[in-house]
């Protein structure tokens, strides 16, 4: 038998198996820095250095590696490792972290060959590595800074990572940088037989057809295969439905039932190893009767259309359906029809936006084990308690959901795409059935085909204004294709409707929204949560009105921009922190200098769920081992909320970073603080953390005064204006400056005071009521707060996007290192949405692979200037911070369209935009490949 020998990190290794180098490094050598993002050579997360050249591990085999020198992050010199850790942390290059080891290796290969690379050389070196979080700019800066450190021109600032001064507004080195850069931080797929010696593997056989009757499932040959533990079907599931809010998603399609999309699971095969698993899946025979699918909104609305769902369960109620309308919303205020009839100028157009894929770098994965009287799931998702609820429902444990324990590990990006269960419930089902640890991991293609996308929209918008350009009214109908299952159709549709009005001052609106079931892949949450679609349409119409009035696009927005004390179109009074006009002023000069080839757009985005729904932030702080340990079941999916929570504690108590840590994010150890969605964690959970930190601070001050502090947990709650202990005793704050960063009264020796409180616990719940949609009030409060933004896009002489100026009102900037990367990443994601990204379907079947999604690469990015506006007057909640994660993705797409409209006079109402230099290429990925 042939053997293959090569060197990995200086050590000779030998194998008799010709396999992917990626799999050998991960499975045989357990080098977890080498990530499996696609296994098709498209993403770069598995990049290693082979004989000095950055190479994707998934396209190299052990046979081809014969005699070669292979280097991973683990094999870099100590000096190189420290340089990259410091540099990536100092500039904010690390968000979800899944792409980072691959980026480091591409950077290390470059720096070893060229110790002083230019920005263009770095862009070129990492063009094969995809990052979906940062927009690449911070990674480029990080590689250049690492090179400067290794040349001896820059020194590592050890104080920055140590974080002795770690409060709000300070440059905070993220808490997870080191483990993500060096690759030892664990995502679910990094769990293996070393963690669970009895681990087995599960994978679903999925439908070949978007709509077909399942006539017969024959798994007998698969079950007879040695190494197969069993094959689970619908009859093995206590409750064969899951769903985030609406339970309409079948766990498995049973014999006699009809599939709804090609991602539907027919059965789950469980085997001792992955080779046996894949062989067994091929042995499962499924007989179908193919049926005509419902391809789009028009077909879904047809009178003779097949009804995709006859009913669903929502909040414990059975809802019967008689058409394909999954959800609908009607948002109205004033009299839009009359206002438009009396307007000096009115414009109407129909807009179309596509499905788009989240393309997070980490495919879905879960590991489940039998645990106590139920199961424990190690998961990558956006809400541990949401997953617990869905999985408990599947088991029929609605009254005892604690039998399901969910622990969130590192999450390799989400952007809304990990709010629904995917692999978690399948792993749990198999673990409970076979009493074994089970790993269920999606391939990249399964991920693309299965998880919910951004909703495709078809909408008609009518906007009017008076002779001076003041908006008078908006009428629109928004139609969403929600695909085969509801996912978060209702909330996303609602947000699209409530934000379709924009951040302006007019009061006549009539907005109808409908979400239709089709046989396409489901659509659900995606960064922007429906607002990207509706504000694209609105902001394009605003430019048309400016032309009719005879004023500039900047001027018409400034005349209508919301200010503190004024009413938004939904009636909510803009609070003191509102700074939309300031964002417009921030880009005014650059826009006016380039007005004939520039585009402008504004946006607003809520923080928190709002609209009268329960949306509490919860946090506990326990003193353990001389540290303040923050417990909150909050998923940090790359946005950096764990770092922000530590900054909140540092600000309130005066503690250094070394005395603060984040505890286990699980439903067993931490309280429910809601989904990482709706730009809510900085505000909602951040305020809960701050409240708990105040309770801790008070106890620390009592220690310094020589007072005895009872060992019982201290519990309190607040609504942003008042705080009460849970026994209804009012909380008396003798330090009014506490609400403003930089003014807190803290102990003289916080570390010593903390040590005296070992074992003490401080619990806080923050809930600020909001009003329901359509509340009968003159000025209802829909959300705790809004962020605002203005983006200016400039085209070059070749009609390519050359510069983007993104000005944001994000309240208090909690971490200046993090905010720029969030804005830059959002801008680039929105640029892809506008120009290159698509998710083509043929008769409801996805045609995309990761490399054909149109994701922009590092050598295609424009200059991005992230501008943040801080006002003196801020909200008292969470030190005045607001969410930045979603709003950064909203205004860039319409600004790009408006720039092209300025240049050639063509209104483009469909995304991705046609007739641009980008549209001549089928995908950005192919363009990048061709340029090599």
Regions found by a protein language model. Name each.
Residues 414-435, 439-441, 644-648, 851:
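Thiamine diphosphate
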Residues 307-395, 560-627, 647, 750, ...:
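Helix-loop-helix junctions that connect adjacent transmembrane helices in secondary transporters/permeases
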Residues 85, 107-111, 136-137, 144-145, ...:
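Short acidic, glycine/serine/threonine-rich loops at helix termini
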Residues 234-235, 397-403, 433-438, 467, ...:
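C-terminal catalytic domains of large/alpha subunits in multi-subunit enzymes
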Residues 148-321:
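Flexible, low-hydrophobicity surface segments
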Residues 1-161, 611:
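Signature of N-terminal electron-transfer/Fe-S-associated modules in redox systems
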Residues 92, 170, 176-182, 322-366, ...:
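Glycine-rich loop/linker segments at domain edges
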Residues 48, 179, 185, 365-370, ...:
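Short beta-strand elements
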């Amino acid at each position: 038998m042939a053997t293959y020998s090569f060197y990995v990190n200086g050590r000779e290794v030998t194998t008799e198996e010709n396999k992917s180098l990626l799999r050998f490094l991960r499975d045989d050598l357990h080098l977890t820095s080498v990530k499996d993002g696609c296994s098709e050579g498209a993403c770069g997360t598995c990049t290693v250095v082979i004989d000095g050249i950055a190479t994707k591990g998934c396209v190299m085999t052990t046979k081809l590696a014969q005699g070669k020198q292979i280097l991973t992050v683990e094999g870099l010199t100590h000096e190189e490792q420290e340089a990259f850790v410091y540099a990536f942390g100092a500039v904010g290059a690390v968000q979800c972290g899944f792409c980072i080891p691959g980026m480091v290796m591409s950077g290390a290969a470059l720096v070893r060959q060229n110790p002083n690379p230019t920005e263009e050389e770095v862009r070129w070196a990492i063009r094969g590595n995809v990052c979906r979080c940062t927009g690449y700019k911070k990674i480029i800066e990080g590689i250049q800074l690492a090179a400067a450190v290794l040349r001896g021109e820059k020194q590592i600032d050890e104080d920055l990572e140590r974080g002795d001064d770690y409060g709000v507004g300070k440059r905070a080195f993220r808490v997870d940088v080191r483990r993500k850069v060096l690759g030892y931080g664990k995502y679910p797929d990094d769990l293996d037989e070393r963690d669970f010696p009895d681990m087995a593997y599960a994978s679903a056989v999925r439908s070949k057809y978007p709509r077909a009757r399942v006539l017969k499932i024959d798994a007998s040959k698969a079950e007879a295969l040695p190494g197969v533990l069993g094959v689970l079907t619908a009859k093995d599931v206590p409750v064969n439905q899951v769903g985030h809010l609406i339970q309409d998603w079948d766990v498995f399609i049973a014999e006699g039932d009809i599939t709804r999309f090609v991602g539907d699971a027919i059965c789950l095969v469980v085997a001792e190893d992955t080779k046996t698993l894949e062989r067994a899946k091929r042995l499962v025979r499924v007989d179908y009767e193919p049926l005509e699918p419902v391809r789009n909104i028009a077909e879904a609305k047809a009178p003779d259309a097949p009804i995709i769902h006859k009913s669903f369960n929502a909040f414990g109620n059975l809802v019967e359906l008689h058409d394909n309308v999954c959800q609908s919303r009607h948002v109205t205020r004033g009299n839009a029809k009359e206002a438009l009839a009396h307007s000096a100028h009115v414009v109407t157009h129909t807009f179309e936006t596509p499905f788009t894929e989240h393309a997070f770098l980490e495919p879905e994965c879960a590991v489940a084990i039998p645990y106590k009287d139920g199961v424990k799931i190690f998961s990558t998702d956006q809400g541990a308690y949401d997953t617990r609820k869905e999985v408990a429902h599947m088991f029929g444990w609605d009254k005892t959901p604690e039998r399901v324990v969910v622990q969130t590990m590192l999450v390799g990006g989400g952007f809304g795409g990990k709010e629904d269960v995917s692999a978690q419930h399948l792993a749990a089902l198999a673990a409970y059935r076979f009493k074994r640890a089970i790993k269920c991991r999606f391939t990249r293609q399964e991920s693309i085909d299965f998880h919910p996308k951004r909703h495709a929209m078809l909408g008609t918008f009518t906007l009017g204004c008076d002779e001076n350009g003041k908006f008078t009214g908006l009428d629109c109908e928004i139609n969403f294709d929600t695909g085969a299952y509801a996912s978060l159709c209702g909330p996303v549709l609602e947000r699209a409707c409530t934000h379709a009005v924009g951040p302006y001052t007019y009061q006549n609106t009539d907005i109808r929204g409908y979400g239709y079931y089709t046989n396409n892949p489901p659509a659900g949450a995606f960064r922007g949560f429906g607002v990207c679609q509706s504000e694209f349409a609105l902001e394009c119409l605003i430019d048309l009105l400016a032309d009719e009035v005879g004023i500039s696009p900047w001027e018409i927005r400034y005349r209508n921009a919301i200010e503190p004390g004024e009413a938004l179109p939904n009636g909510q009074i803009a609070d003191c922190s509102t700074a939309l006009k300031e964002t417009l002023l921030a880009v005014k000069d650059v826009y006016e200098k380039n007005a004939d080839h520039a585009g402008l757009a504004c946006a607003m985005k809520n923080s928190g769920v709002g609209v009268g729904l329960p949306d509490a932030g919860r946090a506990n702080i326990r003193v353990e081992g001389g540290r303040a340990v923050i417990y909150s079941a909050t998923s940090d999916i790359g946005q950096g909320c764990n770092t922000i929570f530590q900054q909140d504690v540092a600000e309130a108590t005066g503690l250094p970073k070394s005395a603060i840590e984040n505890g286990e994010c699980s439903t067993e150890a931490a309280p429910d603080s809601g989904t990482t969605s709706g730009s809510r964690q900085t505000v909602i959970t951040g305020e809960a953390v701050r409240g708990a930190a105040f309770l801790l601070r008070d106890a620390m001050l009592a220690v310094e005064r020589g007072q005895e502090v009872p060992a019982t947990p201290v519990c309190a709650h607040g609504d942003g204006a008042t705080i009460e202990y849970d026994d209804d005793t009012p909380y008396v704050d003798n330090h009014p400056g506490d609400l403003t960063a930089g003014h807190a009264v803290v102990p003289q020796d916080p570390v010593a005071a903390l040590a005296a409180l070992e074992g003490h616990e401080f619990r806080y719940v923050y809930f600020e009521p909001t009003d329901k949609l359509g509340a009968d009030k003159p000025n209802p409060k829909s959300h705790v707060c809004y962020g605002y933004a203005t983006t200016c896009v400039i085209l070059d002489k070749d009609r390519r996007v050359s510069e983007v100026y993104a000005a944001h009102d994000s309240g208090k900037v909690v971490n200046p290192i993090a905010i720029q990367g969030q804005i830059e990443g959002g801008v680039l994601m929105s640029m892809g949405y506008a120009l290159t990204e698509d998710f083509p379907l043929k008769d409801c079947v996805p045609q995309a692979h990761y490399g054909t999604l149109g994701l922009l690469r590092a050598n295609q990015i424009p200059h991005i200037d992230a501008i943040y506006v801080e006002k003196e007057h801020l909200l008292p909640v969470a030190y005045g911070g607001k969410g930045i994660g979603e709003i950064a993705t909203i205004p860039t797409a319409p600004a790009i369209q408006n720039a092209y409209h300025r240049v050639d006079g063509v209104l483009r109402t469909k995304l991705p935009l046609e007739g641009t230099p980008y549209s001549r290429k089928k995908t950005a990925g192919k363009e990048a490949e061709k340029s090599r």
